[in-house]
């Protein structure tokens, strides 16, 4: 499945990566597979919509991960 990374999550990983899909994989497993600390992900989308990282994913899903955004 395709995982799109944004901002600081791209460092040493690139804009998009492929993660091997298996039955029952969820967003938390994807984040862990990429070596990302769960607290480093602020926005989690599946196919462009807000999603729960505990929900199982489909092989054709596109996951997007965003870090916390700051500024003022």
Where are these regions (language model features)?
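Ubiquitin-like/PB1-type beta-grasp interaction modules and other compact soluble beta-rich domains
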Residues: 1-71
């Amino acid at each position: 499945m395709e995982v799109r990374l944004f901002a600081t999550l791209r460092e040493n990983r690139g804009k998009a990566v492929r993660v091997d899909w298996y039955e029952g994989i969820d967003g938390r497993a994807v984040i862990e597979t990429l070596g990302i600390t769960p607290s480093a992900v602020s926005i989690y989308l599946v196919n462009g919509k807000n999603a729960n990282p505990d929900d199982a994913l489909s092989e054709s899903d596109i996951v997007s991960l965003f870090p916390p955004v700051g500024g003022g």
